[in-house]
Amino acid sequence: MKKLNNEDIQAYFQAGNSGFWKVESEEGKKTRLYTDEITNELFGIPEDMSPEKCMEYVAEHIYPQERECFWDYMEELKSHESEAVYRYMHPVKGVIYIRCTGRRIPSSDNMIRLVGYHQEAGDIVHFEKENLLENQLLQQNQQL
């Protein structure tokens, strides 16, 4: 089988509305978030934003009741691969669901580097809610 080229890989992630990100943090400096075009579009991030401002922007747009969980998730990534789904307040679309998967990558310096991808998760959340509802209805019908 032939290997996928970079264009194939990019097309795959565009089709899945999945964007890449990298977070860098080190003592005494602001945390930096680096994003690709898909992630910028997914989060409504202006193109000319610095990595430091980008991290602040995304954190401010996470649904208020889920910010603490988001920061817990970021801490979790420092020790092992993990995934989270959270609500995000997009400046144009309104509230959307985001699925985030990431992990820490090795570093020879004291910097913490996390990498991963974001994906809009509205369809996944909708499917799971429907599944729960169907199971509840099935249980109710079995009790009749």
What are the residue ranges of the model-derived segments?
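Functionally constrained cores in energy, signaling, and assembly domains
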Residues: Y12, K22, R32, G94, ...
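Sensory coupling linkers of modular signal transduction proteins
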Residues: I112-Q143
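PAS-family sensory domains
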Residues: F43-Y117
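Short, charged amphipathic alpha-helical "coupling" segments at sensory-output junctions
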Residues: M1-I9, L133-Q140
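Hydrophobic pocket-lining residues within nucleotide cofactor-binding pockets
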Residues: S25, I105, A121
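PAS-family sensory domain signal
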Residues: K3-A59
